[in-house]
């Protein structure tokens, strides 16, 4: 099975140049001018378009059991929507219940993911601590290719990891060469503020951002960063939404600490006024955590991307329909937290970032694909256009337009946080494993994707929109071999 993309401009995180790209058996076989197609080769005309690495979304929650319900998007529908938006790989989250075996939860999620339309991998959440958890973390790294563990510093009385769990788990991550990640919100403060607001009679969505002010994110980010600094492990902070949290990351990185930050397009574009919409269902549709914030935080986040102190863009794609959101009609703290975004992430970032001059094309590639691949040790197998890399590509039409709407999107949810926004710059074709799965509005994927596992240890040479930062990866990485891969893993980047 072969595919030749002709006449496009190849755009990577470092350079752009005109070239043909030949894909054979799921890999990039050749790059150059005027390539000759092999027999029975599909030819795709890329004239006037950019050929970029397929998007990698490092933060999704498909069919997540959460807050008394289950997210409406399953692994097939969610990854199919991702293909429609140019995303060819996701990293989802295994979230065990407290006291549940990590391995048991991992196999449950892995079973759900078998129907994925594109490639996938997993972070595993640490929701409790014991010697069993420590042992199973080791098995997940050694036998199942897991190389990152998530810690929720929020959601008290549910999945929140207290400081003793953070310390123990970060230490274990260091031993294994895995990357600890955190949802940085002070869960005790959030719980206190929720109860206080409810006692004052504030029950609607407008209370949601008041219960999770930027200070609770800044405090938690600071605490996680200091714990990681003391233990000596890298740290990845998910969905940064506030100036305070960004300041903590910036300060740590200025001292040479390997801390990486993730941002969502919604936090770059939307503000907290959405929670004051007079229509309850509309306001509730925006409820996620951390919440959307006052406009000054958005400008700070753009500066974080431009300075290289924020490194990836994700979606935290976790869909709940209006009927599910209505579970919190009389108590905002019971509104299921989550919004969609996997289909819109890349187009929104291109339109708001590249078209506005805030980001270059190369920075766009880094933020949507390459940096995630580097941090989670999938580079150069993914996030790159080079011979031997996976043929996961997106052919991007810089003049194409799309109006974002729940009426037309492929996400399995009845709400779109970008409703009515028209973007310029969209994927015309999405290619996964060398096959065209999205073509000018036609979703061709009906089969299965495959598991994508990294090697343990944070990669190096991660580039944000600013200068490259070089950080040593844990030595344990070289002793670990991922299993369950579609193809042999490539070594971590050493640029």
From Swiss-Prot:
> What GO cellular-component annotations does this UniProt entry give?
cytosol
Q: Which residues carry this modification: N6-carboxylysine?
A: 150
Q: What is its EC number?
A: 3.5.2.2
Query: Reaction catalysed?
Result: 5,6-dihydrouracil + H2O = 3-(carbamoylamino)propanoate + H(+)
Gene3D superfamilies attached to this UniProt entry? Metal-dependent hydrolases (3.20.20.140), Urease, subunit C, domain 1 (2.30.40.10)
Q: What is the top-level taxon of the source organism?
A: Bacteria
User: How does this chain assemble?
Assistant: Homotetramer.
General function of this protein: Catalyzes the hydrolysis of dihydropyrimidines and of the structurally related DL-5-mono-substituted hydantoins, to produce N-carbamoyl-D-amino acids.
Output the NCBIfam families linked to this UniProt entry. D-hydantoinase (TIGR02033)
Protein name, as recorded: D-hydantoinase/dihydropyrimidinase
Q: Which gene encodes it?
A: dht
